[in-house]
A protein has these predicted regions:
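ATP-dependent carboxylate activation and anion-phosphoryl transfer catalytic cores
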Residues: 1-158, 296, 304-311, 315-318, ...
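Conserved N-proximal alpha/beta basic substrate-recognition cap immediately N-terminal to
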Residues: 100-235, 248
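Short acidic-glycine loop/turn motifs at beta-strand connectors
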Residues: 177, 292-296, 418, 670-671, ...
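Active-site nucleotide/adenylate-binding loops and adjacent lid/helix of ATP-dependent enzymes
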Residues: 182-343, 392-395, 454
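Extended, charge-rich helix/loop segments that form flexible
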Residues: 319-381
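Walker A (P-loop) phosphate-binding motif
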Residues: 465-506
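Acidic, Mg2+-coordinating active-site environments of NTP-dependent enzymes
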Residues: 469, 548, 554-746
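Conserved nucleotide-sensing/catalytic segment adjacent to the nucleotide-binding pocket
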Residues: 513-545, 549
C-alpha cells in the first residue's frame, strides 16, 4: 500500500469539527484479490502490534481498515488526541480514503508513514526495528509539541473557544484574530515590555529597585574579580550565595559558601554564564515561587530540599534508596509524579562531605542529613502547594515588586520560613523576578487540584472570550458572490474600521490590494486572520478549497450560500457501497447510499458532509445563514437551521419565504423592481431599484443582519445608483465627443 495523496484539513471540515489528516491509499491488486495472503499478513501484524493496539478481528478485515486501526493506535501511542477515524472508497479503482482526527499535522504524517512502512515490512516478511522506530516517533512528537508552559495555555484558550495559531516550530502562538489578536511565547505575553524583561534579567538592577521601594532583599553587590568576590563575601556576612547577574533557570548559582576556595570556585562557575557576577547574603528559610498574573497571585509553591533522617542502622545510600521508594517520586519525564528521584550524584556527595558524611555513613537516630548544599539544582526536592498560606502583607509586597519591574506575568522567587508572616519578621527576602516563569509546578501533580494558571493568563489577555473574534462574513464562492463581497466590504468600511477581503479578484485590506492572485481559499483567508489591522473579514471560499483545506475558522458572523456545490460531491461520496467509521478502536459499517442529511457531523458518521451544509452549520452556530432558496438543494437547509436561516428568493411567492415570514423569521425577496427585506409580517426595508438581482438582494439582507441600519443601506444603494448613472452619462458624452476624431483616424 502507498499514500497517493495526503490532505491536511485544518479546522472544521467535511469529516469533523476538528482538524483531520486525510490520506488516499492505493492498494496492490494482488493484496486485494488474495484473501489467504491478506489474512496471514494481518495475523502477523496483529501479533506485532498487540502490545498497544486493539487487534481483535484484524485477520478478517480489509487492508485499509487494518492500516487505519494501526494509524490511530500509533497516534494514541505518542499522546495525540486521535479519537476518531473514517475509511471509505475514494471512487477510484484500488484507492481507499482514510481520515483521522489529529492534533498536529506533522506528527500524524509521521504516524501514517510508520504504519505504511510496518504493513509493507510484514507483507514482505522483512524485519523492522519497531521498538526503535516507536521511540524515535515519540521523541519527534515530544519535540514537535508545544512545551509544558505554552501547551496548557493554548489548551485553556481553546477550551474557552479562543482560536490559536502556532506561528513557528517553537512556542510562539497567536490567540484571537485580526486586530483582536494577542501573542504569547511560553508565559511571556505581548504585554511584556522589552524594558521590563531587561530589568528582570538584571538581578542587581531588580534588587536595587526593590530596595528603593522598601521591599526586603538580600544584601550584596556585583563583583569584578575573584578577590573582589572574596571581599564582598566578607562584607555581607557568611554564608553567601554567588550567582550570575543575568542568567536563568538557576544556572551558575552556588549556595551556602563559607570559605575562600568555595567562593573562588563559585565565581568561576558563575562566569561561565555571565560576564557580571553577584555575591549576596544567604537568607535562611525555604525557597518559594509565587506566580502573579496581572494584579493577582494565582499560585505559590514551597520547595523543601531533599533530606534523610537517620535511624542508627542504615547507611546514607540505603536511606536514599528508601526515600526514592516514595510513590510520589518518579523520573523527570513521568508527569504523574510530583517529585523526582534523588540522584546519587556529585551534588549529593558534596552535601554529604559538608556534613562529615559519605555514602556508607550511618546517621544517628533522628539526625537530619541534607542532600543539597551548594547546588541550586532542585531535582529530588519536595514541592508543596503554598497558595493558601500567603499573608496579605506578603501578597501586597510581591504584587508591588512585579508592578515596579513592569511585568504582567511573573514568577517571584523568595526565601521565607513560611508565607504566613510578613517577610521582615522572619528575615526573608525577594531573590529575583522571572519574566518567563514555568507554570508546571503549580499544576498537577504538585498542586491538587491544579492552580488555574493557564486560565488566568488567558483571562488576562481576553477578559471576555468573544473579544478574540473579529466578525467574519463567509460565502461559498461563485460569480454572484464576487459582487456580494464587494458590496459588503464597501458598507462595512466606515470610519476607522478596516475590512479585509479575500475573493476571486485578490486579497484586499480596505481599498489596498495585497495580492492579485485568486484568494477564495483557506490559505489567503488565514493570512488575513493573522493580519493585525483587519477589523472585519469578508471572504469567499471555493468548494474545492474547503474540501482540500477545511475552514480556516470555527465560527462566523454570517454565511452566504447562493449556489449549491452539491453537484460536485466530495470524492468520498462517489462509488463504493461500504463505509467504515472507527472510534476508540471499534469498526462500524454504514451504507454509503444513506442520505447525507442523516449523517451527524461531530458524532459517529462515516460519510462526509457536503460543503454547503458544513458552511451552513458553522454560520448557524454563532450567527446566521443567508440561503438562496431558489436552489432546490440549498432550500432543504432552511428547516434544519430554523430561525438561523434567512431565506432569500427572486420570487416573492416562494414557499420558504412565505413560511419564514409566517413564523416571524427574517426573509428577503424581489418584488417587481424592488428588494423587500422583512421580519415576520413586517416589511423593514423596501429598496426600489431598476436592476434588482440576487447579488444585491443577498448583500442587503446580510448587511441588515449584521446590524447596518436600513436607512443607511437605502442611502448607500441610492448613492451607488446615482454614481452609476453619472458615470454612464459621462462615458456616453466622452464617446460622442470622440466620434469625429475616430472617423478622422479611420
Amino acid at each position: 500500500m502507498r499514500a497517493e495523496r495526503v490532505l491536511s484539513l485544518s479546522g472544521p471540515n467535511v469529516w469533523s469539527n476538528r482538524s483531520v489528516l486525510e490520506a488516499w491509499i492505493a492498494t496492490d491488486d494482488e493484496l486485494e484479490n488474495d484473501a489467504r495472503d491478506r489474512t496471514s499478513i494481518h495475523k502477523r501484524l496483529a501479533f506485532e502490534a498487540s502490545s498497544f493496539a486493539t487487534t481483535n478481528g484484524w485477520a478478517d478485515t480489509e487492508p485499509c481498515q487494518v492500516l487505519q486501526e494501526l494509524w490511530l493506535a500509533l497516534l494514541r501511542q505518542v499522546g495525540e488526541p486521535a479519537q476518531r477515524g473514517w475509511v471509505r472508497s475514494a471512487g477510484l479503482d484500488d484507492v481507499t480514503q482514510c481520515a483521522v482526527e489529529c492534533g498536529d499535522e506533522l506528527i500524524a504524517r509521521r504516524c501514517l508513514e510508520l504504519a505504511l512502512r510496518w504493513y509493507a515490512a510484514v507483507a514482505c516478511e522483512e524485519a523492522l526495528p519497531v521498538g526503535k522506530l516507536l521511540s524515535d516517533l515519540r521523541d519527534f512528537a515530544d519535540d514537535r509539541r508545544l512545551g509544558r508552559t505554552t501547551g496548557p495555555i493554548v489548551a485553556a484558550a481553546q477550551a474557552r473557544g479562543i482560536p490559536a495559531y502556532r506561528l513557528d516550530a517553537e512556542s510562539l502562538v497567536q490567540f484571537g484574530q485580526g486586530s483582536r489578536q494577542r501573542r504569547v511565547r511560553t508565559a511571556v505575553t505581548d504585554q511584556t515590555g522589552f524594558i521590563a524583561e531587561a530589568i528582570a534579567r538584571d538581578k542587581q538592577l531588580t534588587k536595587n529597585l526593590l530596595a528603593q521601594l522598601g521591599l526586603p532583599v538580600p544584601i550584596g553587590r556585583t563583583v569584578s574579580s575573584e578577590d573582589d568576590a572574596w571581599a564582598a563575601a566578607s562584607e555581607v556576612g557568611w554564608p553567601v550565595v554567588v550567582k550570575p547577574r543575568d542568567a536563568d533557570f538557576g544556572n551558575g548559582v552556588s549556595l551556602r559558601l563559607r570559605t575562600r576556595d568555595e567562593v573562588t570556585a563559585a565565581y568561576r562557575k558563575a562566569k561561565e554564564f555571565s560576564e557580571a557576577v553577584l555575591v549576596e547574603q544567604q537568607l535562611e528559610g525555604f525557597p518559594h515561587r509565587v506566580l502573579i498574573v496581572g494584579e493577582r497571585i494565582i499560585g505559590a509553591v514551597r520547595r523543601e530540599p531533599a533530606r534523610i533522617i537517620g535511624d542508627g542502622r542504615r547507611t546514607v545510600l540505603e536511606l536514599i534508596e528508601e526515600l526514592n521508594n516514595d510513590p510520589r517520586r518518579g523520573l523527570a519525564e513521568d508527569k504523574t509524579r510530583p517529585w523526582f528521584f534523588v540522584p546519587t550524584d556529585d551534588n549529593v556527595r558534596i552535601a554529604l562531605t559538608h556534613q562529615d558524611c559519605d555514602w556508607q555513613s550511618v546517621p544517628a537516630i533522628g539526625q537530619e542529613i541534607n542532600l543539597r548544599w551548594q547546588s541550586c539544582d532542585w531535582q529530588g526536592d519536595g514541592m508543596f502547594d503554598a497558595t493558601d498560606e500567603i499573608h496579605p502583607d506578603v501578597a501586597e509586597s510581591l504584587i508591588d515588586a512585579v508592578r515596579l519591574v513592569g511585568l504582567d506575568v511573573a514568577g517571584v522567587d523568595l526565601i521565607a520560613t513560611d508565607l504566613l508572616r510578613p517577610l521582615d519578621e522572619q528575615h526573608g527576602g525577594i531573590l529575583e523576578i522571572n519574566a518567563e516563569p514555568a507554570i508546571l509546578v503549580h499544576m498537577r501533580p504538585v498542586c491538587q487540584p491544579s492552580r488555574p494558571i493557564p486560565e488566568a493568563i488567558v483571562s488576562h489577555l481576553f477578559p471576555r472570550p468573544d473579544e478574540a473574534h473579529i466578525p467574519i462574513i463567509a460565502m461559498l464562492s461563485d460569480s454572484t458572490t464576487d459582487e456580494v463581497s464587494r458590496w459588503l466590504s464597501h458598507w462595512l468600511q466606515c470610519g476607522s474600521v478596516r475590512v479585509g477581503r479575500a475573493s476571486r479578484d485578490g486579497t484586499w485590506l480596505g481599498q489596498r490590494r495585497l495580492s492579485s492572485e485568486p484568494s477564495d481559499n483557506a490559505f489567503r483567508v488565514r493570512s488575513l486572520l493573522l493580519h493585525p489591522r483587519v477589523d472585519n473579514l469578508v471572504c469567499q471560499l471555493s468548494a474545492e478549497s474547503i474540501r482540500r483545506e477545511g475552514l480556516p475558522f470555527d465560527r462566523c458572523a454570517a454565511a452566504v450560500l447562493l449556489s449549491s456545490a452539491s453537484h460536485k460531491p466530495h470524492p468520498a461520496c462517489q462509488g463504493g457501497s461500504r463505509a467504515f467509521a472507527l472510534r476508540d478502536g471499534e469498526l462500524r459499517s454504514t451504507d454509503a447510499r444513506e442520505p447525507l442529511g442523516q449523517a451527524q457531523w461531530g458524532e459517529d458518521h462515516a460519510k462526509p458532509l457536503s460543503v454547503d451544509r458544513l458552511l451552513a452549520r458553522i454560520g448557524a452556530s454563532r450567527g446566521f445563514v443567508v440561503i438562496n432558496v431558489d436552489d432546490p438543494y440549498l432550500a432543504t437547509l432552511v428547516e434544519e437551521l430554523g430561525d438561523r436561516a434567512i431565506p432569500i428568493s427572486r420570487d416573492a411567492a416562494n414557499l420558504h419565504v412565505i413560511n419564514a415570514r409566517e413564523r416571524g423569521w427574517r426573509a428577503a425577496c424581489i418584488r417587481g423592481e424592488a428588494i423587500v427585506l422583512s421580519e415576520g409580517r413586517h416589511e423593514v426595508l423596501i429598496v426600489p431599484t431598476s436592476e434588482p438581482n440576487l447579488a444585491l438582494l443577498a448583500a442587503l439582507k446580510t448587511g441588515w443582519g449584521l446590524g447596518l441600519a436600513p436607512e443607511t443601506l437605502r442611502l448607500e444603494i441610492a448613492a451607488s445608483h446615482e454614481l452609476s448613472t453619472l458615470t454612464s452619462r459621462t462615458d456616453a458624452s466622452h464617446s460622442r465627443r470622440r466620434e469625429p476624431e475616430t472617423s478622422t483616424l479611420v
